[in-house]
């Protein structure tokens, strides 16, 4: 970091970072050290140190962040270099947003660009944190991006206002409701082609937002489920639409013995010393009975579950679709 701060040729040094992933990681670690000093609320001397650090490095942070953002936004790099570069850029924008000397508008812009860069670095956790520092409403972050970065641009053609605005709104809607990803990506590419010859900032910011949208759609759960159908079962378990039970080794042995008894039509005597063991055995016997009698459902509940109004619910269900077995 000292090399960047004290060296006059800042841009040349940052350009070298894009060609050396180890350099990027080293700089990120050094920036983290600065970050903890800047956020430390202890002692007056730390507060003075904050002012001194801000005075010395905030301009360099800005140069690093915008240079990396511009290069990574306009050119293609290997994934790891791109990820590390966006991570560094996001971190710089986050540091800049802590500068109390900036206007509220500039602080918001820094937080927004930090959130977008964290997204492009596949650091969703930090991206969400930075986004929530600006607004709670899902639509507002996209609206903020549009207004902050396009309202100062002078449009020469009326189609640009309508098309860019429509594209941003569609991206926002798609990300909130998680649908029409492919259509929006195709539409965004169409707008990008129209903006190719523009040098007033439209292409730069719209490409950046499109990159973030692409990364978010690639990592969306619906996209992953389409690519890996088995994930559906996993998601259903996480959302408690399905339940998964794991047997202990001793319980598995009981299950195996019952299977053997059913297959060979022999009687097996199983001794279980605890009440819980007997409960398990009763449940397993009922389970095997249910599997051999299609259409019959049984709900096994402990006695306590039939108290405080739950008994009525259980009886009502049992009349319509199942047999309720009270367990003592």
Language model features by range: what are they?
Residues 1-328:
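N-terminal helicase ATP-binding lobe
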């Amino acid at each position: 970091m000292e090399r960047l701060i004290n060296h006059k040729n800042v841009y040349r040094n940052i350009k070298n970072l894009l060609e050396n992933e180890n350099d990027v990681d080293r700089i990120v670690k050094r920036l983290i050290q600065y970050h903890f000093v800047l956020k430390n609320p202890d002692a007056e001397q730390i507060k003075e140190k904050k002012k001194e650090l801000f005075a010395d490095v905030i301009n360099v942070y800005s140069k690093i962040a915008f240079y990396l953002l511009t290069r990574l936004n306009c050119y293609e790099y290997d994934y790891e270099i791109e990820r590390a570069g966006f991570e560094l850029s996001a971190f710089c924008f986050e540091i800049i947003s802590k500068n109390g000397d900036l206007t509220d508008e500039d602080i918001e812009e820094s937080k927004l660009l930090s959130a977008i860069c964290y997204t492009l670095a596949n650091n969703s956790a930090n991206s969400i944190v930075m986004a929530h520092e600006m607004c709670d409403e899902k639509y507002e972050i996209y609206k903020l991006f549009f207004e902050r970065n396009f309202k100062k641009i002078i449009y020469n053609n009326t189609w640009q206002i309508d098309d860019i605005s429509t594209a941003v709104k569609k991206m926002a809607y798609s990300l909130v409701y998680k649908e029409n990803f492919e259509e929006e990506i195709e539409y965004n590419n169409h707008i990008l082609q129209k903006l190719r010859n523009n040098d007033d900032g439209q292409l730069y910011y719209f490409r950046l937002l499109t990159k973030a949208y692409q990364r978010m759609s690639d990592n969306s759960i619906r996209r992953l489920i389409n690519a890996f159908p088995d994930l559906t079962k996993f998601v259903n378990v996480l959302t408690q639409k399905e339940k998964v039970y794991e047997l202990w080794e001793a319980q598995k042995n009981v299950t195996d013995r019952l299977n053997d008894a059913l297959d060979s039509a022999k009687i097996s005597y199983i001794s279980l010393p605890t009440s819980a063991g007997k409960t398990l055995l009763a449940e397993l016997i009922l389970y095997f009975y249910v599997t051999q009698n299609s259409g019959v459902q049984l709900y096994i509940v402990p006695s306590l579950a039939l108290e405080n109004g739950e008994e009525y619910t259980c009886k009502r269900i049992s009349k319509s679709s199942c047999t309720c077995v009270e367990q003592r």
